[in-house]
Design a protein with these regions (language model features):
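Sec-dependent N-terminal signal peptides of Gram-positive bacterial secreted proteins and lipoproteins
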Residues: 1-32
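A structural detector for beta-sheet-dominated domains
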Residues: 71, 78, 114-116, 148-150, ...
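Broad, structure-driven detector of short, well-ordered beta-strand segments within folded domains
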Residues: 99, 154-162
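Hydrophobic residues embedded in beta-strands of well-ordered beta-sheets
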Residues: 106-108, 143, 165-166
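Extracellular structured ligand-interaction cores
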Residues: 110, 153-155, 165
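Extracytosolic low-complexity repeat regions of secreted or lipid-anchored proteins
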Residues: 121, 127-157
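Short, low-complexity, Pro/Ser/Thr/Gly-rich segments in the mature regions of secreted, periplasmic
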Residues: 164-180
Length: 180
């Protein structure tokens, strides 16, 4: 090889290294499908003392996808997509009462608990927005609000007195009323 050819080849090799030009041994890119994941929320412990978890956007989204679990018991009846179970069992865990519990105690139609921490109607309206509805109430001095992710008789309800939440029910409920 003459000197000119060597200079040209070494210059091309150097330029290729500097600018990243070269052969690749990688395989060409392939389109891959990725599974969509639904938001999931799990709560453990006493809920009444820490009821502000119901304002968390992850919790609210879990209601939309029937992926909420409380103290190891799944509440899969928040959207109306799943049919209400036929079980009549009840279980009490911490400060919560579960109704419609299956025989394995892994699933329930609803859960209810009294709220002892501060949770206001204003906070509910900010978190749930237009999805929050005022329900008719027969008890003087109390009001009930509910949110139904699937616009059916499922979701979450809040019993209030003096604009403070006193009780929360999650799961199967009768939701009617006016939207805000």
């Amino acid at each position: 090889m003459n000197r000119t050819t060597k200079v040209i080849l070494s210059s091309m090799l150097a330029a290729g290294t500097v600018f990243g030009v070269g052969l690749s041994t990688d395989t060409p890119p392939v389109n891959q499908a990725h599974a969509a994941t639904a938001p999931y929320y799990s709560f453990t412990g006493y809920a009444g003392n820490h009821a502000s978890f119901v304002l968390n956007q992850l919790f609210i989204n879990s209601l939309k996808y029937d992926t909420f679990r409380m103290n190891g018991i799944k509440i899969p009846y928040t959207t109306g997509k799943n049919h209400v179970n036929k079980y009549k069992g009840t279980v009490k865990k911490y400060d919560q009462s579960f109704s419609g519990v299956n025989t394995k105690k892994t699933s329930a139609g609803s859960v209810e608990f009294k709220v002892t921490s501060h949770l206001s109607v204003k906070q509910l309206k900010e978190a749930y927005g237009k999805g929050l509805r005022a329900l008719p109430n027969k008890h003087k001095g109390t009001k009930t609000y509910a949110c139904s992710p699937g616009n059916k008789h499922y979701g979450i309800s809040f019993t209030t007195k003096n604009n403070k939440v006193t009780k929360i029910t999650i799961g199967t409920l009768g939701v009617t009323g006016e939207k805000f």
